[in-house]
Amino acid sequence: MKKTYIGLTCLLLLALALFVALSFYGDSLERWHIKTGSFARVLIGDTTRRQRTPSSATDSTRAVSQAPGQDFSQTVDTARKSILFIGDSMLEGLGPRLAAYAEENGHTLVNVIWYSSTTEVWGRTEKLKEYIAEYQPDYIFVSLGGNELFVSNIRDRRQKYLDNMLSQIGDIPFVWIGPPNWKPDTGINEMLAETLRPGQFYLSYTPDQHYDRARDGAHPTRASASAWMDRVCAWVMRESAHRIVLHRPKAARAHCHTVILAPAK
């Protein structure tokens, strides 16, 4: 009888040892699939759960890589957008490149070029509001300031017009592209930076940004303007207040509906 108990005990110990070994062994034994045992998880903890990579983002949003100190909860709005791009003659170079981005990423784009325009020219009219009503954009780009680099006392003379433009834009997400200075300005960039909210203003005049100039010495060449737009679009996806999909296009430029306004008198 004693030998029988000893034999049963040995068999139980052998079975337990085999169970423990299989629990730690892994996911397969030769060609047989073996589910990792919960016993091993109890002993060493479920390391696979702690080390699991995050699940992919939903279809409506996509996670964006962040620079140090940025909000890691920020996501990209992946919906197709109806974009309105308004501004001065800088749109001649920027517009076709943004059109290529729009075409590549499924957006629609309307460019409105008002030659020689300024914040005052736009802000003393309701033109912006009219174009918003006509084209119903859900995202706006603005490129203004190049004709105001040397305006003295600019806050006293331009702030109210800038405020009126922002009032016309309302709650529509937008990005304001600052001018590509060819000389130091008298305050236009500072006024824009201090008036607009974080992530709404792209400062184009920084030491690390280079511009090849056209014959007038002010406007960037077509190639340089395209590179400028590339930087803006990359910034929109990474750092702007409302990030949209702007993957770099294969085409260098594209056509879109464009409205031309003569210089204001």
Locate each region found by the language model.
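Alpha-helical cap/lid subdomain in secreted, periplasmic
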Residues: K2-L11, R124-V245, V259-I260
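Phenylalanine-focused residue identity feature
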Residues: F19, F24, F39, F72, ...
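Conserved SGNH/GDSL esterase-like catalytic core that processes O-acyl groups on lipids
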Residues: S73-R158, K183-D185
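N-terminal secretory targeting modules
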Residues: M1-S82, E239-K265
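Short amphipathic alpha-helical segments, especially helix-boundary/capping motifs
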Residues: D71-V76, A102-N105, L166-I169, S204-D208
